[in-house]
Regions:
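Short loop/turn segments that connect beta-strands within beta-propeller blades
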Residues: 67-71, 116-120, 164-168, 208-211
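Short coil/turn segments that connect the beta-strands within blades of beta-propeller domains
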Residues: 52-53, 89-90, 142-144, 191-192, ...
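Structural motif
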Residues: 64, 102-113, 154-161, 202-207, ...
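Conserved beta-strand positions in repeat-built beta-propeller and related beta-rich domains
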Residues: 56-60, 94-106, 147-155, 196-200, ...
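A short beta-strand motif characteristic of beta-propeller blades
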Residues: 31-38, 70-76, 121-128, 169-177, ...
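Beta-strand-rich domains and repeat architectures in extracellular enzymes and scaffolds
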Residues: 34-61, 81-84
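Blade-loop segments of beta-propeller domains
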Residues: 70-102, 107-110
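Repeated scaffold domains used in trafficking and secretory/extracellular systems
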Residues: 41-46, 79-87, 130-140, 179-186, ...
Length: 266
């Protein structure tokens, strides 16, 4: 091979390698406010993206894939109760409870279901019965999965169950959050921190560090979904209803705010 051709190929290859993370960041940053096409029987439980061109919406008994404009690309019926979800290496991981939530005696039936992010085909089911009050939310950090869920009345802390890539429990973390109604609904790790959406009156956003030490407790509704998309940029979900009572889903840009937790951006 001629030296000039070899040099050109090396330059192109290097540019491609260097450009790949930049393109990924650009793609993530291109996510904007969006409404999910269609209406659904049950309310939104969580959202995530593939960090490129798709948004995933969990409507309790419907799992929906849309493009960045909210146009449905794929939709499947799923078992109740499919909760929050996260994306990792081409797969969706969904927190699923087939039993009772928030029961002091347990009686939950907690799982993580794994789907192909392109086709929504079911790949695997992992038991997570350690999530005693019902698996409702999930996030991923450094290739490990963190499952959250229900909570009985009066319990003044929340729990995070850490699993390895094979869904073997490695640790149960305690968040000194104070009581949150029905536990934690949604979870995402972004910008070096955990963000947890909770029910309540008012609804609560919890923020912790990587060791689940409290960084903030804010009166903000992220209980239907929260996902990071770029540095200093997240999407939070809303779930209005139609006049017939059918459930809708939308995502709204937000940025971190020291006093409020997050602020919607115009």
């Amino acid at each position: 091979m001629k030296p000039t051709i070899m040099i050109a190929l090396l330059v192109c290859s290097t540019m491609s390698i260097l450009d790949s993370p930049v393109r990924a960041a650009d793609n993530a940053a291109n996510f904007e406010n969006v409404k999910c096409e269609g209406d659904y029987q049950h309310h939104l439980q969580g959202v995530c993206t593939n960090e490129r061109d798709a948004v995933y919406w969990s409507f309790t008994t419907d799992l929906v894939k849309t493009d960045r404009l909210g146009r449905v690309q794929k939709k499947i019926a799923v078992a109740s109760h499919h909760g929050d979800l996260c994306f990792h290496k081409g797969k969706l991981y969904v927190a699923v409870n087939l039993g009772k939530f928030n029961d002091p005696k347990g009686n939950a039936d907690s799982w993580v279901y794994v789907y192909d992010a392109d086709t929504l085909g079911l790949i695997a089911k992992h038991e997570t019965q350690e999530v005693f009050h019902g698996a409702g939310g999930i996030g991923v950090m450094n290739g490990r999965f963190y499952v959250v869920g229900g909570l009985p009345d009066g319990v003044e802390e929340n729990y995070v169950y850490e699993y390895d890539s094979e869904f073997r429990l490695t640790r149960k973390h305690v968040i000194k959050s104070g009581w949150t109604q029905l536990g934690i609904q949604t979870a995402t790790f972004h910008d070096g921190a955990w963000w947890f959406g909770c029910y309540g009156s008012p609804k609560i956003l919890l923020k912790t560090d990587t060791n689940f030490h409290m960084l903030g407790r804010h009166e903000l509704d992220c209980s239907l979904g929260i996902v990071g998309i770029a540095k200093g940029r997240l999407l939070i979900a809303k779930g209005p209803r139609t006049s017939e009572g059918r459930c809708l889903g939308s995502l709204h840009l937000a940025r971190p705010d020291e006093k409020r937790g997050l602020m919607l951006t115009p």
